[in-house]
């Protein structure tokens, strides 16, 4: 009888310890994606298009692909690297952006027009942390490691930097992560190609930030059905800056629907988001 009680006691202790670890790990994971406290002053954000098949400055080079630079008071983050390091580095130099001033790279998905510039960039600056979706092939990991850069694999939503978050890896194909920025004016969503569907990504972003609206959705929208234009309005996207793979005809419909809330985005475009204004500059 005593032996049975001892066994039962041990089982109860084991289960209790297991539950404690499970709860502790769950809380730790959630803390990673908690938005900054409302008491913290949200920073001004600058987003610059450095690689795209659209452009607003004829002095810059254009090619199929996407890359933009996000600047906060804390860091410079490169989102995707376009398809060619030669073009990426040319545009950065033209815009007086030193590759060595960039601390982090976030890659949205595996397609060459988004990761093709990585190798050449790392030859210029390997003092970066590269954030990749968990399902990326080993060849990309090996490239990053061979350049002695840091690597961080992402599957779930997580904090990248102060006020900057990954949506986590969303199912495609291919699987893809997007960036979410908590700015002075509200949430800014940046997509590489939106293979999981731009509406799905917006809904995921809203779930992460626990807000009803997205201030600005920017990037490649993967030529969605025309009905998506009105649907984004309906689910709370206030401004749009579609580029890259969105498609000319869809961009035109976005421009008609959003009017002054449509932002032309292409190489050379700079969007500065401040508390009292959102300005558009060009190099």
Features from the language model and the residues they span:
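Metallo-beta-lactamase
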Residues: 132-177, 183-184, 263-282
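Short, structured coil segments at secondary-structure junctions
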Residues: 95, 126, 146-147, 235-236, ...
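Cap/insert and terminal regions of metallo-dependent hydrolase folds
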Residues: 117, 187, 193-274
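C-terminal regulatory/interaction regions
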Residues: 4-10, 25-35, 245, 249-283
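Zn-dependent metallo-beta-lactamase
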Residues: 5-74, 156-169
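Active-site metal-binding motif and surrounding structural segment of the metallo-beta-lactamase
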Residues: 86-131, 206-216, 233
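Active-site neighborhood of phospho(di)ester-bond hydrolases with catalytic His/Asp-centered motifs
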Residues: 78-81, 103-110, 131-134, 189-193, ...
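Conserved beta-strand hairpin/beta-sheet module of binuclear metal-dependent hydrolase folds
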Residues: 48-94, 176-191
